[in-house]
UniProtKB/Swiss-Prot annotation:
Top-level EC class as recorded in UniProt: transferase
GO CC, any one term: cytosol
Record's keyword terms, sorted: ATP-binding, Kinase, Nucleotide biosynthesis, Nucleotide-binding, Transferase
Database matches in HAMAP family: Thymidylate_kinase (MF_00165)
Protein name, per record: Thymidylate kinase
A GO biological-process term: dTTP biosynthetic process
Top-level lineage group: Bacteria
Gene (UniProt): tmk
GO molecular function, one term: ATP binding
């Protein structure tokens, strides 16, 4: 049986890392994952050795000249293609589960809505990179822009996080639009951590029940 593919999306500061950690602990201790299978936690960009090098090119603020928007898009696609072939597809084919911090939704939100690149161009490129692999469920952890800024106040931002308020607003609007898809579940990330993980667990149980 093919494994489950779970993705977390959201603007920076939405609490994806916290909720991924909470969910992984719960799944490992539950009986939802078949006994002989495992759970793999990964991220984009940077889920593979090659991807880590691409991540550095994309996000490092010390690089003198940042990649232009199209170069940036192609680098994300290259990272995703390698990620699919090296990690995600082999893991799912073994019946194991995958949780990824970001996937295609981030590219559509950041490069499409944020950078204003052509959405259809991005979708065509994503089709090549993903080769038919799609999440079983995507959680959008939704927070207001002001809350994102407040939460990131004391941490060092990467190159994308340093973009201005207007860019972040456009990205947030992109995520809102994407979350209308039936495989997406939007969850308020300003609620308590306990309430958030409770909602996530409930959706995972529904996913298993309806498989």
């Amino acid at each position: 049986m093919k494994g489950k593919f779970i993705v977390f999306e959201g603007i920076d500061g939405s609490g994806k890392t916290t909720q991924i950690n909470q969910l992984s602990k719960w799944l490992i201790s539950s009986d939802l994952i078949p006994e002989n299978n495992k759970l793999v936690i990964t991220r984009e960009p940077g889920g593979t050795k090659l991807g880590k090098s691409i991540r550095s090119l994309l996000l490092d603020t010390s690089i003198e000249k940042s990649p232009d928007s199209i170069t940036e898009l192609l680098l994300y696609a290259a990272d995703r293609s390698q990620h699919i072939n090296e990690i995600i597809r082999p893991t799912l084919d073994q019946g194991d589960w995958v949780i990824s911090d970001r996937f295609c939704g981030s590219t559509l939100a950041y490069q499409g809505y944020g950078r204003k690149l052509d959405i259809n161009l991005i979708k065509d490129l994503e089709a090549i990179a993903t080769q038919g692999i799609a999440p079983d469920i995507t959680f959008l952890l939704d927070i207001p822009i002001e809350e994102s800024i407040r939460r990131r106040r004391n941490r060092k931002d990467d190159r994308i996080e340093k973009e201005g308020r207007e860019f972040l607003s456009n990205v947030s609007l992109g995520f809102q639009a994407l979350s209308e898809d039936s495989n997406w579940k939007k969850i308020s990330a300003i609620d308590s951590k306990e309430k958030i993980i409770s909602e996530i667990k409930s959706e995972i149980k529904k996913l298993i029940k309806n498989k």
